[in-house]
């Protein structure tokens, strides 16, 4: 429910709808969400007709913005579209008779990263942060009696201490900021006292309800990283009633680190959401991740970063770069691994 991710989800839903009816659609869709309003913009080349207002409202409703007090509500918000035709100058460099030889939709560098510290080969701190928010959303949508005050907007962050060999030692800090209903002030206490009681209640629920549910999802060696010394920051400003697009304008593509590796590896700067596969910002980053993940899963290295770069209108990448951070398990240099990747993938 974070505003930037609301925008990302709307952009991706529009992309999905175009591709569902025309698999060759070329889409670059941007979304802005703010108080009571959604603005759609971008470039599209497609034979499909999409009711963009309906798609946007369905996404907003599914996320949970369904109450007027949020000042951003699925049925009543305005949806303004300024989507137009894709540039012919770009399209002529992308489309080919052979679809497997289409040109890249833009220039740039893309990175894929993998590590064996989790079962899905994602960095542990990022994976834990995602799990916290997935579980918080699950409680809000399907087990609301556990934390009935939850609203859609939320963020999390996890800090992990590592040893000199890159192995996680313990979880140092967990940050959870979650939007919530206004708590009713009891008679005889001030608003400030009520707010403090509210913050204490939410912090207790995060520690006693949310954390155990997230911890239980992980294998024993990850569970062992949870300890009594973890520093918790739960709604550290003290109050989070005003949130969502009303509290913070959201834009597509502003959470690129959350969407990738949480600061590990590297990033070329291009966002994913709202872009069809001809946009190498997305497809090449996915391909680089696929390569890194499979090589780490195969035991080639404990950790791997794969970088590719493209020129607009050119089908093949200009280069492949590999960094195993000194954690390779084969008698090959990173350059030799890169050469194997070029021949195999």
Residues covered by each model-derived region:
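Short, charge-patterned binding micro-sites
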Residues: 28-46, 312-316
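Glycine-rich, mobile lid/loop segments that gate access to catalytic sites or pores
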Residues: 36, 54, 58-242
């Amino acid at each position: 429910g974070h505003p930037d991710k609301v925008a990302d989800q709307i952009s991706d839903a529009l992309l999905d709808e175009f591709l569902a009816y025309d698999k060759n659609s070329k889409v670059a869709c941007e979304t802005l969400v703010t108080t009571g309003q959604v603005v759609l913009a971008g470039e599209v080349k497609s034979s499909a007709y999409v009711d963009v207002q309906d798609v946007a409202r369905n996404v907003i409703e599914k996320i949970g913005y369904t109450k007027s007090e949020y000042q951003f509500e699925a049925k009543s918000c305005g949806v303004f579209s300024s989507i137009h035709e894709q540039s012919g100058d770009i399209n002529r460099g992308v489309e080919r008779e052979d679809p497997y030889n289409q040109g890249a939709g833009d220039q740039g560098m893309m990175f894929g990263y993998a590590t064996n510290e989790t079962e899905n080969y994602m960095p542990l701190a990022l994976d834990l942060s995602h799990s916290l928010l997935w579980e918080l959303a699950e409680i809000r949508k399907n087990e609301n009696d556990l934390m009935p005050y939850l609203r859609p907007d939320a963020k999390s962050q996890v800090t992990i201490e590592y040893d000199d060999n890159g192995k996680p030692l313990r979880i140092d800090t967990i940050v959870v900021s979650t939007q919530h209903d206004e708590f009713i002030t009891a008679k005889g206490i001030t608003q400030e006292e009520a707010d403090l009681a509210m913050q204490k209640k939410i912090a207790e629920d995060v520690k006693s309800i949310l954390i155990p549910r997230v911890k239980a999802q992980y294998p024993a060696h990850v569970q062992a990283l949870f300890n009594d010394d973890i520093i918790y920051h739960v709604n550290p400003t003290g109050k989070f009633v005003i949130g969502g697009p009303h509290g913070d304008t959201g834009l597509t593509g502003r959470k690129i680190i959350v969407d990738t590796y949480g600061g590990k590896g590297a990033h070329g700067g291009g966002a994913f959401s709202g872009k069809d596969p001809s946009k190498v910002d997305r497809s090449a980053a996915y391909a680089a991740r696929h390569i890194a993940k499979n090589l780490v899963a195969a035991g080639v290295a404990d950790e791997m970063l794969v970088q590719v770069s493209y020129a607009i209108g050119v089908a093949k990448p200009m280069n492949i770069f590999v960094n195993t951070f000194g954690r390779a398990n084969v008698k090959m240099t990173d350059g030799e691994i890169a050469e194997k990747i070029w021949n195999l993938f």
